[in-house]
Amino acid sequence: VVTKALLNLDYTPSPSLLPVQSQLKVYLNDELMGVLPVTKEQLGKKVSAQIPIDPLYITDFNRVRLEFVGHYRDVCENPASSTLWLDVGRESYLDLTYQSLNVRNDLSHFPVPFYDSRDNRQLTLPMVFAGAPDLVEQQAAAIIASWFGSRTGWRGQNFPVMYNGLPDRNAIIFATNDKRPDFLRDAPAVNAPTITMMSHPNNPYVKLLVVFGRDDKDLLQAAKGIAQGNVLFRGSSVTVDEVKP
């Protein structure tokens, strides 16, 4: 969640504006966040200003709107006058401070937190194997990567591969009863294709989606279950009992 937001604006007001009467209004989702009056000293010069944004008004999808109120004379103004302008620089940016939440290991919101449609950044989702994957493991990973990739669309996606290690971010783990990364060596054996959500052993804010199986064929069946969407995700772990051919 966002705990702090600060809008950093670079702008240049027209030298013909009336000070104080001319101003720049800042809105977030149509709520007024602040007003920047144009002073005499700022006319025709580049100005840097900061506007605090109340994080309580930040939603899943947000819009920052700037409204210029400009005056160049006290009476008989022409609203279409070429002297009425304020140029906002492309160096302007919104600075956000985040606080991670300790999410429960609950698959009912899957594919969150591994993919969130509200996040417009490129998806980076590491794939972790015990060692170099064989052909069936590669097929399972390709199915899951394709499924996530079909959802990211224009955002783009990246699936870095790691052997017998753990990244510091949400990841997909492939493990069988006989072949698994070291951090899962004490995990109990499974008797069916299983999908489990667990916390990173060193960071509870990072989640791991573990695709478990008795063997590689189970991994492939679990991957197909995810792709076909016929798995009822709930709780921290589910089994994939049947998939379409």
Q: What positions do the PLM features span?
A:
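Solvent-exposed alpha-helical segments and adjacent loops
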Residues: V1-P245
